[in-house]
Amino acid sequence: WSAPWRFDAVQRAGGSGFVIKGKRIMTNAHVVSWARQIIVRKYQDPKPYLAKVEYIGHDCDLALLTVEDESFFEGVEPLEFGELPKVRSTVVTYGYPAGGEEISYTRGVVSRIELSVYSHIGNRRLLSVQTDAAINPGNSGGPVIQDDRVVGVAFQGISGLENTGFFIPPPVIQHFLKDTQDGKYDGFPRVGVNLATLQNPAYRALLKLPDNNQGVRVDRILPKS
């Protein structure tokens, strides 16, 4: 409060990304959210390039960047997307965990595929893939590769658990990309209601439901649904 005219100290953070067709870079939304300036560098190239967010999906934790200087893309082949990997198949993560100048490669196995909470905004459950390949801070936004194709984008781990990382699978990525084709990102649809299960006996008694009644109760309809 002694100097209210001063801005907060600028903090530096890093992540990973990869080039896709259309001269764009894909990364995580949480890597570039609230950034005052975005600087990207190519592998083994010390030159910094200014980038800006073209599209961002906070619900699916994905973002597309464009680079002002198109010379950034010279000699760079865009990566192609593959299909959803199978459980117990092998994948390789690429990225810069904890920063560093050299890219890191980590091999792992697909452990399971299920709906899970995306921690970036914490209130959406979308399809995700769990792997035992290490995914650490700095890996975020990096590609997960199988058979020379991108089968995911690394995006989160679980604090306190070893060999447990998660990546965003192709169905979510393709939905995000298709959504941006009209020039704006609308996001993943939601049902628009809050539901309550009817398993609790006290709750069932409150609603005066018979014992053989099953289903869920609509507690609330969200605005604009």
Where are these regions (language model features)?
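Gly/Ser-enriched beta-turn/beta-hairpin loop segments
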Residues: 3-10, 55-60, 113-129, 180-186, ...
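Conserved active-site neighborhood of the chymotrypsin/trypsin-like protease fold
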Residues: 14, 21-103, 137, 159-162
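Conserved hydrophobic positions within beta-strands
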Residues: 17-19, 51-53, 110, 144, ...
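Catalytic nucleophile loop of clan PA
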Residues: 18, 134-153
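A generic structural motif
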Residues: 55-57, 71, 114, 135, ...
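C-terminal cap/linker of serine protease catalytic domains
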Residues: 69, 73-74, 97-101, 150-213
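Chymotrypsin/trypsin-fold serine protease catalytic domain
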Residues: 90-125
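PDZ/PDZ-like domain segments forming the peptide/carboxylate-binding groove
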Residues: 133-134, 138, 142-143, 197-225
